[in-house]
Amino acid sequence: MRLVLVGPPGSGKGTQAERLVARFGLTAIGTGAMFRDAIDRGTDMGKTVGPLIKQGLLVPDPIVNEVVAELFRGPGRPERFVMDGYPRTYAQAVAFDALLRLEYLRLDAVVNLSIADEEVVRRISGRRCCANPVCGVCFHVVARPPKVPGQCNACGGPLVLRDDDKEETIRRRLGEFHKNTDALLDHYRRQGLVRDVDATRSLDQIFADILTGLGNPPAFVPTATEGRAS
């Protein structure tokens, strides 16, 4: 199974990606996590994309496309995967289509998680993440508060409001998202791949709707070889 998750920030793509990974044995691929790691490590890429992400702007297509292409060209390329945060633009979708053709792979579905902007702002602005780069666990001041205010349950590190979780940044990111998403979804609708899902429902209901949209495929059962490899 090969999937793309589309949705604004705060729509729950990461959470649903985790559930899809657990059920179907997929590899989760998130460009946002890749870039945050590069920023934390102070790499050349991190220095390039850091200011853009801080302002709520999209990373240029050529940079994102190359990061993803390197992953798929490598010896351990993913065969079954769920993409979280890529492609985000029509140009990225075209580049990804070309990359998959070169690798003799094809997408099975594009899951579109829809949610109102104000709900996105409410969700993200309440998020607090562990400042420890080794940990990075995130909480929510209302929906998932830590046991001790301002302190990570996992490692005890301080919880902070990340720059890209501030309201002004969120609204800029939403503007960028809406500007690019119509053409992206039209591209995939023409291929018959889009499955629309209401992301305002409960996490369990959203996941059930995703499974329905995918035709309720059976859960993945690893072979003995795959079990030993893991």
Language model region names:
Residues 1-230:
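Glycine-rich phosphate-binding loop of ATP-dependent small-molecule kinases
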